[in-house]
Amino acid sequence: MDTISKVIGEGTYGCIHSPSLFCQGSTQQEINKISKLMTTEEATKEMKEYVIIDNADRAQNFYLGKPTKCKLDKNPKNMKAISKCINIGDEVLIHYDDYSLLIMDNGGIDLDKFSKNVEGWADTTENKKKMEMFWLEAHRILLGLKVFLDNGIIHNDMKQQNIVYNEAENRLNFIDFGLMSSKTKVEASLRNSDFWLAI
């Protein structure tokens, strides 16, 4: 049975639903996946960024793997879920054909939500163990930043909402590579800038 997808995140360029919205022509919902709804142009750009990340992290130690891109299906369940997108919902419902989905693994909740959950935890041995496991896993973020650095990658949107944590698997991952750039491009733009603090 299909489930109405819920908005689990929203930013400037996209709206994220879990479970995934339906791809065009699909009759089956990806229950264990999430979808990022965005303009086809932005989705195409972001897919190119994933090629760079995948080359740097072939074993997918620091991100969830390359998503798949598909056109958005115009069905009532999608439309109902999209109407809950605050930033882009109305625009999508008018210009449906201009939007696509990136379908990806669900990496858990972002660190902002996780920290709010933790605030409500009781002071128990079990919860202390959970936090210890989280902090042991947090080294993955530092290792991932080193991989980015070694490969000349700048994420450009590093914040708690762009790191997700799957508590059941005790796994942290970077997400949202839409603003990613290369160190070479950033250095070139700084050199060509007339802003006195650029370099």
Where are these regions (language model features)?
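Conserved N-terminal boundary motif of the eukaryotic protein kinase catalytic domain
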Residues: 1-7
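Conserved structural core of kinase catalytic domains
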Residues: 60-133, 186
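Catalytic-loop of the protein kinase fold
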Residues: 148-166
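Conserved hydrophobic alpha-helix
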Residues: 141-148
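ATP-binding glycine-rich loop module of kinase domains
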Residues: 10-83, 90
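C-lobe/activation-segment region of protein kinase-like
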Residues: 170-199
